[in-house]
Amino acid sequence: MSKISNDVLRESVSALVEGAKTKPRKFQETVELQIGLKNYDPQKDKRFSGSVRLPFVPRPRMRVRAGDVKHCEQAGAIGVDAKGVEDLKKLNKNKKLVKKLAQAYHAFLASDSVIKQIPRLLGPGLNKAGKFPAPINKNLEEMVLDTKCSIKFQLKKVLCMGVAVANVGMTEGEIRTNIMYAINFLVSLLKKNWQNVRCLYIKSTMGKPIRIY
């Protein structure tokens, strides 16, 4: 059962979108869900991690990368960056170059034949960044859409986190839908559900945080 008031969410999203319109930016502002937790000890309690597919793409310009020759050709046809094994070999496990690669993309996809070689080719860099490639196990275009729609919640050492769940170019209804999907999934990951939620805010990239819970 959600504890978010529909009226509060509607007013908050409207205020966020209006705020973004009054000061248009040269880039598409994302809408971040900011979460504060309570009654959780990251040292003792299990650190949760989970991904959920949202109904609408939160970041249309999200950068995804894919690999192997066949998939590289498919990727090029749908406007997705791609690199083959030979390109990865050129990085020569250089930590700085692998880190730069991880920072340049939101997510990575790889063919089975390539995934097996990644630890040997790149070392642990992508894994440390939480961006180890997902295997391409169906139509690449579908997988790219799934990846662009998916968000991940992961508790680390502190009881707060922020996740991009929408962008200001979406309709207010789409933004609200994505926010509620994200919140309901997050609550399902928590040990005591809503009892672990201290506060929730939404914020556009350049806007002020707006409390919704």
Swiss-Prot record:
Give the source's domain of life in one word: Eukaryota
Q: Which GO terms describe its biological process?
A: translation
Gene Ontology cellular component list? large ribosomal subunit
Do you know which Pfam families this protein is assigned to? Ribosomal_L1
PROSITE patterns from the entry? RIBOSOMAL_L1
Keyword flag Transferase: no
Instruction: List all membrane-crossing ranges.
Output: none
Q: Which UniProt keywords apply?
A: Ribonucleoprotein, Ribosomal protein
Entry-linked InterPro entries:
eL8/uL1-like (IPR050257), Ribosomal_uL1 (IPR002143), Ribosomal_uL1-like (IPR023674), Ribosomal_uL1/biogenesis (IPR028364), Ribosomal_uL1_CS (IPR023673)
Q: Which GO terms describe its molecular function?
A: RNA binding; structural constituent of ribosome
What family does the database annotate? Belongs to the universal ribosomal protein uL1 family.
Annotated protein name in UniProt: Large ribosomal subunit protein uL1
Organism field = Chlamydomonas reinhardtii
